[in-house]
């Protein structure tokens, strides 16, 4: 089976980390996010991934020049202009002939880290004779997502994009993993922006051809600072991951943190509940709490980062400075 992975967005929610690279090339523990996605797809029987590219496509082509990512074959489809989610699917599918194939294909959001069993999704798709089948996952607050109520047979009854929390009919949301028949590509209009969530799926609901599978599998949308941080802390805990090539002073405190290779933590410094990128220096007495620091940065002596502050690559935080819930540099300029 083949899969289209949507990785063309600008990653604005993760700025300043994404000012110079796509979010799917940001590290998650010891490898880029896209390798977690490709590895999961390969483990579920996908033998070829088509990356739908837009923002900084060279980051992917240079990282995987041999066309392999986590053991899965890659093909590239670079959009000349962003045409939203459905437009990206149409472009990628046509670029590699998925719209003319005689079998369904997968579509996956490239910032989702999950262990969903794709075989169950494909089985429901075939059993129901669906045109498209989507995975659903439960969340506490569905207001940031597409909420999807379904009938007893899995047929989707409505597709409600980002409802008010108080008015959401359920907490089962679109998990960003779809099985699509080639006919879906023909539903996507040419020459303009088209959202699969706001336009294509609601039309399929009206036609009765959209189905969904509810799944309690582990699932994280890693596209925000809070979730990008939490997924790494959870994966480190779950897998027993340990940092390598770091220098931590014996008097420093490092708890529930992810330190990338080359990180240095000085005397009396504290790093807790945080992610620190490669070659970053945490100087003596500094505190990094519940925050993210990019690569090659310096957190000055006695400074404090907390409240989910995000510090970009190669930034120098002056000694004694206190950042609370701040972005440095400010993406807004």
Task: Specify the residue positions occupied by each region the protein language model found.
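Histidine-centered beta-alpha loop that forms part of the nucleotide-sugar donor binding/catalytic region
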Residues: 8, 54, 110, 137-138, ...
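A structural signal for short hydrophobic beta-strand segments in well-ordered beta-sheet cores
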Residues: 25, 147-150, 201, 212
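Conserved N-terminal catalytic core of the sugar/cofactor nucleotidyltransferase
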Residues: 1-5, 13, 27-113, 118-120, ...
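Structural signal for interior beta-strand "rungs" in well-ordered beta-sheet cores
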Residues: 242-333
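Short beta-strand-to-loop element that shapes/binds the nucleotide-sugar donor at the catalytic cleft/hinge
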Residues: 55, 133-150
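Catalytic-core segments of class I nucleotidyltransferases/pyrophosphorylases
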Residues: 104-106, 113, 119-126, 139-142, ...
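Generic preference for hydrophobic
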Residues: 25, 76-77, 159, 212
